[in-house]
Amino acid sequence: MNNIRPKYYAFYNKISEGYYNPLYRKGLNKDTIYEIMVEDGFPTEKNVSFVSIENIFQQINFGSHIAEVFVPGYVKTSYNETTLKHYADMCIIGDIMNFYDINTIRYLIDNGANIKNCGNLLCQASQLGCIDIVKLLVKTSEKEFSGMDDLTRSNKLISTQEIFTDFKNNDHNVCILIAIVYKHIDVVKYFISIGEILSVKDDSLYFKLACDTGCLNIIKYLLEIGFDIESNNNYCLMISTINGRNDIVEYIKSRGVNPNNHVKKCIQIITNHNDDLKSSDIFLMTKFIKTTGVNSNILYQLLLIACEYGYYSMTMYLIKAGIKPTNSCLKIACKNNKFNIVKLITKYPKTRLDINVDNNYCMKQAIFHKNKDMVDYLTNFKYV
């Protein structure tokens, strides 16, 4: 193999035993590495693509497996500086390897893989719970970032990630957020062990995500390091009740929280109304109240409040839950100029509300508020 250039690698995703996407074929390959099965056909990209070992950790997307790629010296190649990928019409494919195996990652590092910008890989390893890979990347980065502690180096690596953009630049450790979402407590504990300090403020995203995903072990751990089980208006109790996570609800109760008392508190909060409250918070409380099994009279009172303040999602939720809107709901919505609610409760199937109720009260309110759209809507209204 005198005429063969240095090794490159191609990524593959394992679909089933012996089948990979793109198609893996050991040996000589000509425009076949990216054959993808679509509707039993095999469309082919123009060229084979692969990445150098130096840039293998800098990719935005990785595969579950990799294979060595050898390119004969007489084969012409091209290079994309944005994707860091090389292209050729022909190459020789070697053995396939599990990319997320610690031995594979160690081998790549030992043979020249650059980890300075491996934020995407660090995040992916956190997502998959590959704690050994996470530790290896942070440890090995000592050569790139000398004089820094483990936490500072890990944050340097994380800052280069491009795949979890929703979590980026929000003063949170992205890898911990990802590990919480995918329920990998070992990854969470590791970053805490190297010095990461999580904010335990009332609206902490860390604790909220743990409750959203319903991982009791992570919830317990976060409480051990200082988080409050009743934070953010008992968010954990409410979302766990809504999601049917009885194990978490029972655990919360064991810590002295009374769900019935919180139901009463939520009803009072919604009834008293506060302009500082977000509609999403009110919607969450409404779902919690409904899930606990309160009687329909209470839910109807909540529907009236939703119509008064224009809470569209809350109104829709209560109607779908079986609380039928009445002419009183319609009048309240018109009085408060909530055209979105007027349209919802008059067009919703089977409501059949009287838009002319109380001597054209709704039209008078629309005119009073100078709401031309509502005037036109009521003028041209036809029952479904």
Curated annotation (Swiss-Prot):
Superkingdom of origin: Viruses
Tagged with keyword Nucleus: no
Keywords linked to the UniProt accession: ANK repeat, Repeat
UniProt ANK repeat ranges: 88-117, 119-146, 171-200, 202-231, 233-261, 298-324, 325-357
A Pfam family hit: Ank_2
Protein name: Putative ankyrin repeat protein L72
